[in-house]
């Protein structure tokens, strides 16, 4: 009987420890995308909006929010001209959060225009599009 009780105690301890770990990770500011970019760039998480900073992949808006100058990352910008000057694109897209003072450069005109059109859309139009896609 004692071994079964110890087994359950270990299982409960494991579940409590993992729930604490995941709770802490969700509340941290600037949580990395759980990928390293020491030798290769962010690959899998790049599709989720992550870029390399200090050899760790971070979400793009976190990099832009924590930046003190535009020189901290090659894709940070405040205007389209900044993207041209840095050679990182031709369109500077702002983030939805107005507390983020820098935008993000896009290389292709097509991506920039799509994002620009999306940002101009009203929420009801976005819902119509998502309903049409779901059908």
From Swiss-Prot:
Contains 3 disulfide bonds. The keyword Disulfide bond applies. The keyword Disulfide bond applies. InterPro entries: Albumin_I_a, Cyclotide, Cyclotide_bracelet_CS, Cyclotide_sf. Keywords: Disulfide bond, Knottin, Plant defense, Signal. PROSITE patterns: CYCLOTIDE, CYCLOTIDE_BRACELET. Residues 1-29 form the signal peptide. Belongs to the cyclotide family. Bracelet subfamily. The presence of a 'disulfide through disulfide knot' structurally defines this protein as a knottin. This is Cyclotide cter-B. It comes from Clitoria ternatea (Butterfly pea). The lineage of its organism: Eukaryota, Viridiplantae, Streptophyta, Embryophyta, Tracheophyta.
């Amino acid at each position: 009987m004692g071994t079964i009780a110890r087994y359950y105690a270990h299982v409960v301890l494991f579940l409590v420890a993992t729930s604490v770990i995941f709770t802490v990770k969700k509340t941290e500011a600037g949580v990395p995308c759980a990928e390293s970019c020491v030798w290769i760039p962010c690959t899998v998480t790049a599709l989720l909006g992550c870029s390399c900073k200090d050899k760790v992949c971070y979400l793009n808006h976190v990099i832009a929010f924590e930046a003190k100058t535009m020189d901290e990352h090659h894709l940070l910008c405040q205007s389209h001209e900044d993207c041209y000057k840095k050679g990182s694109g031709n369109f500077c897209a702002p983030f939805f959060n107005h507390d983020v003072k820098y935008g993000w450069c896009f290389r292709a005109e097509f991506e920039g225009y799509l994002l620009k059109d999306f940002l101009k859309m009203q929420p009801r139009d976005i819902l119509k599009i998502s309903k049409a896609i779901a059908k």
